[in-house]
A protein has these predicted regions:
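A polyanion-binding, active-site-adjacent surface
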Residues: 1-194
Length: 194
């Protein structure tokens, strides 16, 4: 898939590759700076995102915006936000493997076009799809993983953090680790490994 941004957005908008398209209100392509160094990847749109056509606009989105602000980032400025799937799974369930596979070329092309310096996988579904693993978030935290030559860090999904307040401190540690990793990448030093 060699499409540029406008053609890729149009392809996602017209996609019928899996059953999720049948009940969507809008596709949720992604949002942000198309030249961003930071890419945050979630699992899929919820009801608010389906209605607005933008990722992370509900309560989890408000928390993500606060998390970004805490590390001196903001949506749309050197940050791009995307999801593994571009249509809402019914009942906010996790995307099924076939659904994620149908959207994989779109996310891959977004990453190719962005060429981010760092990817942050938000939650197990994003990490599992980007890293082809079924490992737990807890076991993947605190390490720099590799996604086709791009450093990738795993943390908890903001929706999970809304339900599990005790893991917010761990997510903060992950964000601090991401900042240190990015600083190392920008200075040309090797990224920290733990």
């Amino acid at each position: 898939m060699r499409m540029e941004w406008p053609a890729l957005k149009a392809a996602v908008s017209g996609c019928t590759e899996c059953a999720l398209h049948a009940k969507r209100d809008k596709t949720v392509f992604g949002v942000g700076d198309e030249n961003a160094d930071w890419l945050f990847v979630g699992e899929g749109p919820g009801a608010d995102e389906d209605a607005q056509g933008e990722p992370f606009v509900g309560q989890a989105g408000k928390l993500l915006d606060s998390m970004l602000a805490a590390i001196k980032l903001q949506r749309g400025t050197n940050v791009y936000i995307a999801n593994v799937v571009k249509c809402r799974p019914p009942g906010n369930r996790n995307p099924e493997p076939g659904e994620a596979l149908a959207c994989e070329p779109y996310l891959d092309r977004q990453i190719d076009l962005l060429r981010p310096k760092l990817i942050v996988a938000l939650g197990k579904v994003a990490a599992a799809n980007l890293l082809a693993t079924d490992a737990s978030v807890a076991s993947m935290r605190g390490k720099v993983h590799d996604y086709r030559g791009t450093p990738l860090i795993v943390t908890y999904h903001p929706a999970y953090l809304l339900r599990s307040l005790t893991d917010k401190a761990k997510a903060w540690a992950d964000l601090c680790f991401a900042v240190r990793t990015m600083e190392g990448l920008q200075s040309g030093a090797n990224a920290p490994r733990s």
